[in-house]
Amino acid sequence: MGPRATTICSLFFLLWVLAEPAENSDFYLPGDYLLGGLFSLHANMKGIVHLNFLQVPMCKEYEVKVIGYNLMQDMRFSVEEINNDSSLLPGVLLGYEMVDVCYVSNNVQPVLYFLAHEDNLLPIQEDYSDYVSRVVAVIGPDNSESVMTVANFLSLFLLPQITYSAISDELRDKVRFPALLRTTPSADHHIEAMVQLMLHFRWNWIIVLVSSDTYGRDNGQLLGERLARRDICIAFQETLPTLQPNQNMTSEERQRLVTIVDKLQQSTARVVVVFSPDLTLYDFFNEVLRQNFTGAVWIASESWAIDPVLHNLTELRHTGTFLGITIQSVPIPGFSEFRERDSQAGPPPLGKTSQRSTCNQECDNCLNATLSFNTILRLSGERVVYSVYSAVYAVAHALHSLLGCDHSTCTKRVVYPWQLLEEIWKVNFTLLDHQIFFDPQGDMALHLEIVQWQWDRSQNPFQSVASYHPLQRQLKNIQDISWHTINNTIPVSMCSKRCQSGQKKKPVGIHVCCFECIDCLPGTFLNHTEDEYECQACPSNEWSYQSETSCFKRQLAFLEWHEAPTIAVALLAALGFLSTLAILVIFWRHFQTPMVRSAGGPMCFLMLTLLLVAYMVVPVYVGPPKVSTCLCRQALFPLCFTICISCIAVRSFQIICAFKMASRFPRAYSYWVRYQGPYVSMAFITVLKMVIVVIGMLATGLNPTTRTDPDDPKIMIVSCNPNYRNSLLFNTSLDLLLSVVGFSFANMGKELPTNYNEAKFITLSMTFYFTSSISLCTFMSAYSGVLVTIVDLLVTVLNLLAISLGYFGPKCYMILFYPERNTPAYFNSVIQGYTMTRD
């Protein structure tokens, strides 16, 4: 025996204990093809009491559920409208048989009844492909747990089942439920609409209340997972106590409600999401009213979002703003009149029996209860009824296709459940300006709406304030909401206020929504899209002020021609160049005179030429550094300057040799003269300087670099050498040594003849260079700002002037103004006088 047969046998006994109470015309209408309807006409909570007894609960023992009865009336209206339509199913009469499923175990008996034959027998067969059940399709039930129970039976027969309000995502599994479809969006869309509502109003600190049944647990878990991905935190989540059937609330359950409302009072969260059947909420909201809890935003799940009985607790208006997620409102022409006409007709007569009846087809108080809520049902826009309406029409259109109907006739024949199911999957038609079709998961893409509860009798009690489109997964058409706050301000529900621009979050506690706001320091910025908890450092060429979300390009600082210090130094350099050029011309014209020859002769022209080149290198200090300008700064100028100083040092040594060492060390002096000692020395010094320059360039490179101005971080100083201070000491070490040597030899020759006594001029030049270089290094060790470049250039020009004017200036002065002292006779007399004095 297969698993299907085993399942059927285990429940076969129930088919023989079916009661036959009085028939009510609301529940049964004969026809060529019957639709089964499962509606909750009485309110009862899931419990365990009736599961201990082998009997079906009697729904009439519980309170009437107005919405359920209203939905049942809509199915009656839909079938009647289809039967009156001469084009949809011409010549075919559609009937129905509906059952009240107020309790979880009530679903088993009706589904077996729907599957059985007219004689209440359900045969055990190996193949049900050609089996014809009592009904061709089932509409309902309303909640996910009951739908799964029914679907597990109907799926064995592939009997079409269309639910109108069950939203569980489990129902999308077509492997488990191949015959199940629904005319309402899934829980995924309901939760997404809630989350987008919270995001729109920037609520990130909420409270979640759930019922203890599967509906509450599953939706609470789904909401928690969705909120975690959107950085919305749950302050706390509580489970509402669930009453057992026909039982009063116990003291423990009462205390539980008191504790929950106390936590609501103490919490800083002001948005409360409630997933629960409506009956559980009556005692809860009464406790809320008793403790005078106000100022909340209540977000209702679809199970109670448009419940007229809860809305009838008018004092709830003082507890805050009520928003609910529900199906879109689609007015059905004529339905309100149909319901009111049916209510005015009064209850059906009792005592009428029928062998077709099953149990729980009674609702003596439904008409009176519906009549008392008729106004609110009419004003609310008949929301969920369209889901039932479209479900019935989907079956009718499938029958239209299956029976080969045209505008006048249909071919009546046996309809097998699996055939009708295939046609239902294919339906695609327009109903009241809405396209009706099922996606691959069996869902219908109807819009959801956010409704606000209103208690003004002249207004819709469930006023639409926004709409959610499942296909776009987007909240649209958000309208103004009447907030129950001072000055109608939007309620704030945040653990921590939103940080201002440029502030990072410092977590406080375990919730990501609770944090402190700390300003980002200068030089850092906050990238909200990457990390809200750490400020990122700006790139090296950018900067930011405090509390910034982006960095800006640092201003590049270098010497520019329009700046006053640059102009002043350029004028000094021009003066030095012109004066050096003039000295060169004077020396050229008086090349054969003793004054020029005593100053060094050809060596003077080498020095003057190098000085002119050094002056011409000065402009490379101005403007943005480049590889070529850096090469001139680090190689050409130091080399020129070193050769000049080496010439002075060698010239001083040569004079000392001529007057003091020639007589003492004649052999050494002869070698010095024979092998061109001055030029060999200068060549050696030049090569040594070139080695120093090459080593410096290899160590630091020629590419321009930038460094931050210590006085103003938004400025980047562009320079040729990142370690200019260290490289300056390295490059000038030889020059400083030569200046000391030149100074020493000049000091040794202070007793020489006047025309050869250059001690005071060399001392002036070398002392100035030595002092300025040491001062520059000292200045750079204490300061590294933008003034370094201009001070370096100024010292460079002054050192050049010290040689040009300090060393060559006095000689030009003697040549021009004392020509009588620039004769061989005068020089010889001076030398003879020096010799006689030494003797």
UniProtKB/Swiss-Prot annotation:
The chain crosses the membrane at residues 567-587, 603-623, 636-656, 682-702, 728-748, 761-781, 785-805. Pfam families: 7tm_3, ANF_receptor, NCD3G. It is a multi-pass membrane protein. Residues 588-602, 657-681, 749-760, 806-839 are cytoplasmic. GO terms for cellular component: plasma membrane; sweet taste receptor complex. It is found in: Cell membrane. InterPro entries: ANF_lig-bd_rcpt, GPCR_3, GPCR_3_9-Cys_dom, GPCR_3_9-Cys_sf, GPCR_3_C, GPCR_3_Ca_sens_rcpt-rel, GPCR_3_CS, Peripla_BP_I. It comes from the Eukaryota. CDD domains: 7tmC_TAS1R2, PBP1_taste_receptor. Residues 20-566, 624-635, 703-727, 782-784 are extracellular. Residues 1-19 form the signal peptide. The keyword Transmembrane applies. Glycans are attached at residues 84, 248, 292, 312, 368, 428, 487, 527. Its main location: membrane. One of its GO terms (molecular function) is sweet taste receptor activity. The keyword Acetylation does not apply. Keywords: Cell membrane, G-protein coupled receptor, Glycoprotein, Membrane, Receptor, Sensory transduction, Signal, Taste, Transducer, Transmembrane, Transmembrane helix. PANTHER family: CALCIUM-SENSING RECEPTOR-RELATED (PTHR24061), TASTE RECEPTOR TYPE 1 MEMBER 2 (PTHR24061:SF517). Forms heterodimers with TAS1R3. Belongs to the G-protein coupled receptor 3 family. TAS1R subfamily. Putative taste receptor. TAS1R2/TAS1R3 recognizes diverse natural and synthetic sweeteners. This is Taste receptor type 1 member 2. The gene is TAS1R2.
